[in-house]
């Protein structure tokens, strides 16, 4: 899920004179692996009968608690001004949409397909930001969007989709749109604050919605055994770790390199789904997956313009 956040205004930059950039690279790659592990573990729990609402409620509750503890331990601010606090909590709605859409899609389509569709979120952000922030749509980015959607058509296959597959595709697309909404709304309403504090509030807002849907839904805590609960907690820890590792690495190598490296997330997810869930990609679908990832990388390339990433877009973010 997870592909949630970004810095929403506070200037982030690579630490000057950083002599060990490989540590930053390793942290961002570990972050990508954390996000990937979280969705794969949650998908395993879904296949064992755990409901989507149950899974998201537990995962994001654990992630929120872990992020809160890390913020306090690091002496970083937790509180926000009233205006920014309400805006960040409001972003929890988009967190909720992303969680329901992304994880819900794995009930109907393979995880490897869901992550590719979900990862088209930056493309939606690209076109929306043209009107909200006058972000230029360059030829490179238009070509990248075309490549990504061409690859997506290959990855989904040329055959007609079943009703359940259509539900999965639409669910993943809703998650991608939720991600784009998070990025766009956050960059317009929240500025000059610690991005991790924004993440904390938005995750908390999303968690509250997940819990409400869990307790007022038709089948609360369905399929939640002790083993499944441990798995979901592990998934939540992976999310929390991923956020902490990402921003630690970003400070060392800057947002441009961090955004590029985070594009390894779908690669990790597809690989993990193959080994853990037994998912397989045909030759044509493998090419399609490669094209999607290539398109997203091109969108985030420095020469294409300001990085448009699912987790790192923000005004004021720059690299020294």
What is each residue range found by the language model?
Residues 1-54, 58, 93, 101, ...:
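Glycine-/small-residue-enriched transmembrane alpha-helix faces in small-molecule transporters
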Residues 2-7, 67, 120, 137-157, ...:
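Hydrophobic transmembrane alpha-helices of multi-pass small-molecule transport proteins
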Residues 15-16, 63-81, 149-163, 205-228, ...:
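Membrane-interface helix-cap regions at the ends of transmembrane helices
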Residues 22-30, 53-69, 85-86, 140-150, ...:
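Hydrophobic alpha-helical transmembrane segments of multi-pass integral membrane proteins
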Residues 34-39, 68-114, 118, 154, ...:
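Specific transmembrane alpha-helical segments of multi-pass solute transporters/efflux pumps
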Residues 45, 55, 59, 105, ...:
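Hydrophobic/aromatic residues within transmembrane alpha-helices
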Residues 54-65, 95, 102-136, 175, ...:
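Specific alpha-helical transmembrane segments that line the substrate/conduction pathway
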Residues 57-58, 114-120, 185-208, 239-275:
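Helix-helix packing/entry segments at the starts of transmembrane helices
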